[in-house]
């Protein structure tokens, strides 16, 4: 009589994940999604013309879901890197809460429906821009740039800068200078923000084999690049004021916020070792988040204030 080896049966059986709603939400990278939604909202409210509230909500949901889908596909592809890094080891796939096929299906499904819904219900120019954003982040940045060049963040930052452009196009069906200015601000903000993170997570990236700038070129060169990009960022962020696109309130606030960020970048450049260096990089990283939210909040407040003024004028 033959004996059935139950161990072999168990090993051959497909693994069923224990994923819950929270795990799928985590795949969407909620913190990154919040930045996507916020910058897109500013781009939408700055756009001229009337936009039906239902279409506005639809467009924002599509942009949010598309951004989350890109995050899920990023986690699907980078599960090997995530498992090696302390910062990302608790993500759903490395923990075994979600399988790679499940994450891929989830990301692809959300990508498809977000783009198609935006195209059918709003307009196809915005949908094409959203599709390009997802493609750029997943294929160009995640699959190619991140593992091949120290300039991964610089070039790949274009994906994170596109949401306000998508939102503007959702309203107008076209492009203009204003959304491109918002794009430029986020684009030049990205390197100082992520390189500050990379400086105090250098060992993590080195262990995972990710060629971030501190790993490839060293911390000192990274500090110099942070300073240079911060100088460019301050200039780019202030430029819409003298160019006549945003008013003096924004201009003065951008100079004040940019001035403090520049001070923090100088401290990162000057302090190169010990606890002072770690504190400087952490402070810059934390403030850079506040900087972008504050800058875009000022634009948001101005738009709302003008709308209220016109309503009661």
UniProtKB/Swiss-Prot annotation:
It is a multi-pass membrane protein. GO terms for cellular component: plasma membrane. Keywords: Cell inner membrane, Cell membrane, Heme biosynthesis, Membrane, Transferase, Transmembrane, Transmembrane helix. It catalyses: heme b + (2E,6E)-farnesyl diphosphate + H2O = Fe(II)-heme o + diphosphate. InterPro entries: Protohaem_IX_farnesylTrfase (IPR006369), UbiA_prenyltransferase (IPR000537), UbiA_prenylTrfase_CS (IPR030470), UbiA_sf (IPR044878). It is an enzyme of class 2 (transferase). Disulfide bonds: none annotated. It holds the Pfam family UbiA. Converts heme B (protoheme IX) to heme O by substitution of the vinyl group on carbon 2 of heme B porphyrin ring with a hydroxyethyl farnesyl side group. Belongs to the UbiA prenyltransferase family. Protoheme IX farnesyltransferase subfamily. This is Protoheme IX farnesyltransferase. It comes from Rhodopseudomonas palustris (strain BisB5). The lineage of its organism: Bacteria, Pseudomonadati, Pseudomonadota, Alphaproteobacteria, Hyphomicrobiales.
